[in-house]
Amino acid sequence: MKTCYYELLGVETHASDLELKKAYRKKALQYHPDKNPDNVEEATQKFAVIRAAYEVLSDPQERAWYDSHKEQILNDTPPSTDDYYDYEVDATVTGVTTDELLLFFNSALYTKIDNSAAGIYQIAGKIFAKLAKDEILSGKRLGKFSEYQDDVFEQDINSIGYLKACDNFINKTDKLLYPLFGYSPTDYEYLKHFYKTWSAFNTLKSFSWKDEYMYSKNYDRRTKREVNRRNEKARQQARNEYNKTVKRFVVFIKKLDKRMKEGAKIAEEQRKLKEQQRKNELNNRRKFGNDNNDEEKFHLQSWQTVKEENWDELEKVYDNFGEFENSKNDKEGEVLIYECFICNKTFKSEKQLKNHINTKLHKKNMEEIRKEMEEENITLGLDNLSDLEKFDSADESVKEKEDIDLQALQAELAEIERKLAESSSEDESEDDNLNIEMDIEVEDVSSDENVHVNTKNKKKRKKKKKAKVDTETEESESFDDTKDKRSNELDDLLASLGDKGLQTDDDEDWSTKAKKKKGKQPKKNSKSTKSTPSLSTLPSSMSPTSAIEVCTTCGESFDSRNKLFNHVKIAGHAAVKNVVKRKKVKTKRI
């Protein structure tokens, strides 16, 4: 009668690992052979069963598998075949079934550790031989494994006995698909090969007897597919269960096999012995190495030496090889790589690089780098001017004016003088008849300052009571410390141009103030308005709203414009302002 492992240890099925350990120690002290000298044989068998039960239950995986198959293991009788739906299957087809194999998961069957018929070696060995025979027969049905004789070994066990059959086939490893379990004198290395092979067991059985439905040709296509699907599912489940059961049985027998424990112990002792011998040899060499220093000298082997006469030949070969490599490299030529450091790209040809330079991506990256460099220069104080350099400064305008074509300059001056002469002749008798205003426009790098003079009729001026000027200026932001410098440079340029003696048809030179801000004239009794800041070209002592007229050449002041014009006419102090472009820029008022 089989005994449950939990009952054998005296614990509940939900006992913890600590409770199992305490129960095993208690049972071991009770049934250990040393504690029972009067009944050693019975105590040994009982103690072996207790130890096997504890080894199974102490392993979580083994315990889970035992709990799921406990009823089948404890059942001594094979499964009943009296069911209505069950049918008898030939044993040669099924071989050892899963249910039959579960009957041997009983440690009480392996209490005798000897070579007898009731011992563990013959019981377990015959089971493994039967399993190997089933696999060979299944393989031969599939047209495989014709060279293996595992089925012959099982037949020899029945005819000549297990021990003699093992002796006949133990050395025929090439004729056996699965190694033999052997018996007590079997080598430890052979046993390791046995357990390694059987631990990777995978059956070749078809398990067709596990089909749930009988296949018939009369079924329609849909029914056939469904029947095949369900039958294949049942076969696969049975196949997986069989493989797991065989692997569990291998682990179960390995725990009971003393040969593995003794062999591992002997192998460890041999390893330690060899390690100790190696250490002793090293110590002896170190100890006696100094005494035999003169006698035991290191000598090069014949294959480690090179004859002197061969050195010259080797050097010649090396020199020739170097010349050959150099000539080869010269033939190959240099490989040029074209690289754009801005975009971090490489090109194989110069044409590709040029095409890349014309792309929008390269230009965009180039502009970003230029802006970053400008910002860094301003931050570090490396530039004398700020971002206002993008606009026309006084220095730039002077340099640009020096490069202007003389003919274009003369034509512009003649046009300005003609307009000034006409406006002065019409309104010379009255001060309010002339409304000449000048405006300065600060444009982009390519533009210069622009002068525009508009006149309005007297009737229109009386009606509106205010002169309206249609010129707009662009306000320039500049540093205070550069205003005087730019004004002086512009005055010098105007003076130099005036000295050339350019005159109109009436021999009169008229000069207009180059940089005077125009604005609306305020009415009487009206609120004061904010005046526009004066530009850098005006004298620093003169405000934009002052009524005093000043000669830009000699600096003399006059109360009215007529006096200023008479002075310019007599003294010839006409200052000329060149106009290259006429571009109106709207000014946004903030």
Curated annotation (Swiss-Prot):
Coiled coil: none annotated. The keyword Phosphoprotein applies. GO terms for cellular component: cytoplasm; cytosol; mitochondrion; nucleolus. The modification Phosphothreonine is found at residue 504. GO terms for biological process: endocytosis; regulation of cell size; ribosomal large subunit biogenesis; ribosomal large subunit export from nucleus; rRNA processing. Transmembrane segments: none annotated. Present with 2310 molecules/cell in log phase SD medium. PANTHER family: DNAJ HOMOLOG SUBFAMILY C MEMBER 21. This is J protein JJJ1. It comes from Saccharomyces cerevisiae (strain ATCC 204508 / S288c) (Baker's yeast).
